[in-house]
Each structure stands twice: as structure tokens, then as C-alpha cells.
Amino acid sequence: MAMMTGAQYSESLRKLNTRVYMFGEKIENWVDHPIIRPSINCVAVTYDLAQDPQYEDLMTATSNLTGKKINRFGHIHQSTEDLKKKVKMQRLCGQKTASCFQRCVGMDAFNAEYSTTFEIDKKYGTDYHERFKKFLEFVQENDLVVDGAMTDPKGNRSLAPHAQKDPDLFVRIKEVREDGIVVRGAKCHQTGSINSHWHLVMPTQAMREEDKDYAVSFACPSDAEGLYMIYGRQACDTRKLEEGADVDLGNKQFGGQEALVVFDDVFIPNEYVFMAGEYDFAGMLVERFAGFHRQSYGGCKVGVGDVVIGAAALAAEYNGADKASHVKDKLIEMTHLNETLFACGIACSSEGHATECGSYIIDLLLANVCKQNVTRFPYEIVRLAEDIAGGLMVTMPSEKDFKSDMVVGRNGETIGDVCNKFFAANSDKCSTEDRMRVLRFLENICLGASAVGYRTESMHGAGSPQAQRIMIQRQGNIEGKKALAKAIAGIK
């Protein structure tokens, strides 16, 4: 099968019998639902860019499994050049959508699974690696979107999986059959899960022997029997339900998506099981996935940041403040922060190395440094954007007010006339509507629906800040640095 277009991808979702719930109701036509559709449009961009000759080098790759041309989101990295192209591809997709385009988690899961299953097989004589390669060939051949599912609800964080009051708070193997396993539990915060054809489930943390039932990794289709999803809310999400909504959305065409994915006794055939009780490899899988995903943030968040910086510059221009030295300095600082994130993403890619199975992995220390910076810099970037934009970003009347023909003035002025009069700014550079549009975009990305992906996801996605600090401590080689200091200081 040839690579799909964005339109073909969207149509492929209609063939699935995915169970989706929102606001306490089952959503029958979720593909066209106004709250969900922008997130589908985002994923569609990753297909359309792969069809564009201008972006072919970044968006496509040659499969190491089949030798065929595939979408890079389904590729196993074969070199440091592949790792760098991944980051550049993610920046491009962020620039084109100003949103989370949802395919990075699956790509990072593929690469973590590929090397980890090889090492499990080496120790235990299992055939997980061959199973996974066959599954990945299927994904590549059909150009599918796969949700990488790692985060469990976790319950009481002070307790191990087996010690929880409710055993379902971590995904677990409930039953082992001759032809497969039955799994139960849920995965939280799942980016793009509803827009995915399949799910690739991984353990959420390192495990001990008593937690071996929770050391499970598998793949299953989105419409598997017993699987259903409950859509997560975002700030200002119901604006998308307003009749004729456009300007007030800030980003009408694109958006992100998260959901709770529930596995209610789902049967997984053996061919799609890639870990089943090998608890001593759960930590390796988590660590490698986290490293890849922390690298990803040096690409996707940078692309979104490019749009935020551009919007802030436009807001300054439309306000007539673009020549002010302090505004220029703020834009310089925003650019400095954004490019620092990109530098980290490229650095951890450039310092990558081959794994035992031949695929390439990033430098884990630098990947964690990358994500640690991502937990901070987007917050400062949006703070500066709000500073430049001014208070109107959050006090502006609605689009309907600007278009209203209701007469309110002594001389026959309408609400629309009044709004357009008093909210005009640098009229030589922009219309009042254009000013509205850029301010609504900034509202959306700074504290609206898109803030989920640019702010809070930057904090907690791919691991919360302390998770990176733990890895930096492990990888930082303090003893080696102490030895260097002793040698220079003349200490025996």
C-alpha cells in the first residue's frame, strides 16, 4: 500500500468502530465532531507533508525492514542523521500546526520497543523482537497511526503496582491463555489516542518481581473488544461548539487531543505481545522510550515556539510598538530560548549511538537536559508573548460583538462599529480583525486549549521535571568529574 494522504487518513478513521465518550455521552460520529476534528486535521498534516517533494527528505525514510519508502513517523532510526532528521521533522510539523500533531509518542515507542525486545530475546530466548518487527512491517505497509501508551493512573504514588488497593490502577495481565493474554487497566493522558489506528502499550515504570504481572507490553487496534476511550477536556474547548466560531478559537483548524484509554478485559493474541512478565526489562523500555520522547520535545515544542514568536512580533507591529527597544529585546530572548531547545534536540541526536540490534538511540544525558529545559522555557516564552501582546489578549469582546449590527449609539452606531472603532490600533498595518486574530491565537496558546500542548505538556509530558533530574544525576558522572578536579588540584 502506498503512503496515505491526509484525506485518506481521515477517511480511514471512519472504518474503525472506536468507542469514544465525551461529556457523559457516546460520540457516534467522532471524526466530524467539532471538538475532535482539529486534532484529526493535525495528524493529517503529517501525511500531506510526506507527499510534498519539498519536505520528502525530512518526512520520509527507507524502511530497514522492507527497503520501501515510508513515513518517517514509522521509521526505526538507523543513524545519527536519522535522529537529527526526526527533530527537524518535528519542528516542521509544529510550525505547520502550532499544535501537538500526536504521532511522536508512537514513533518513540517503536524505537524503544525495537531495541528492548531484541535484548529480552537475547536473555530469555523469547521471540518478541520478531513479533515486533512483523507488527511494525504491518504498520509501515498500511501507513498507520499508532498511539504509544505508557502512563498509568498510578493511584497512590507511594505504593508499587501490586500493592495498590485497586489492582487495575496499572495495566496488568489478568489472564494467560495458550493463544494470548487478557489485559485490564487504563492509560491516562493519551495524546492522539482516538485518532490512532492501533495502540502500543508499555509499562509505566521499572518493576520488581512482585510486579511482574504489570510488566507487559502489547499492541491492539483502537476498536478492540473491551477497549474504549473517554475524551479529556481542555480550557475553552466548548468555544468550538459555538455556531460560526472562527476568530475566537485562535487556531480554528488545528488542535491537540488527550483521552483516558480503558482496557476492560481485552484479549491480546500472542503475535502482538512484546513483554509478558519480564519485569527486569521494564525499566530499560521506560528509560529508552523516555529518552526518545525527551529528544522529541527539542523539535515539536520548538516548531510551536516559532509560531508563538511570530505571533508576538505581529502583535507588537499591530499595536505600533514593534520599534520599541524593549519589545525587540523580548523577541530576542524568546528566540534565544527557543533555539536553545532546538540545540539540545540536535545535540542529543548528534551524540547518539547504535544499540545491540543496530538501531540508533540518542545520548540519554543530553536528551534529559533537553527536556529539563523544555519544562521551563516555553513558560517564559509565553510570559514574554503575553507581555508584548497586552491585556486585550484576555479582555477582548467576542467575534459576534465585532460583527453585531445592534444599534447602541446616539448616532446609530452598532456594537460592531463601537468595537471596531475602539480596538483599532496601527491601522496602516492591519485591520481590527487581523489584530483580533493574532491576539486570540496568543490567548489560545498561552492559556486556552492549545496551552495544554505547549505549556502543561512541556512540564509533564515525557516525564515530569524530577524524572529528568534523576536521570541527569545517574548519567552525569559526578565521580568522574571529582577525579578530574583532584587531578587538577593535585589531590592524591
Q: Where do the language-model regions lie?
A:
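N-terminal-proximal low-complexity accessory segments that begin disordered
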Residues: 1-49
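Extended amphipathic alpha-helical segments enriched in small hydrophobics
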Residues: 296-355
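Alpha-helix capping/hinge segments and adjacent helical runs
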Residues: 365-492
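Short, charged, amphipathic alpha-helical segments
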Residues: 328-332, 360-368
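N-terminal low-complexity or amphipathic/hydrophobic leaders
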Residues: 28-91, 356, 457-461
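FAD-binding core of flavoproteins
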Residues: 148, 153-300, 470-492
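Glycine-rich flavin
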Residues: 61-198, 203-218, 223-228
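Generic structural signal for well-ordered, non-transmembrane alpha-helical segments
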Residues: 41, 137-140, 182, 303-306, ...
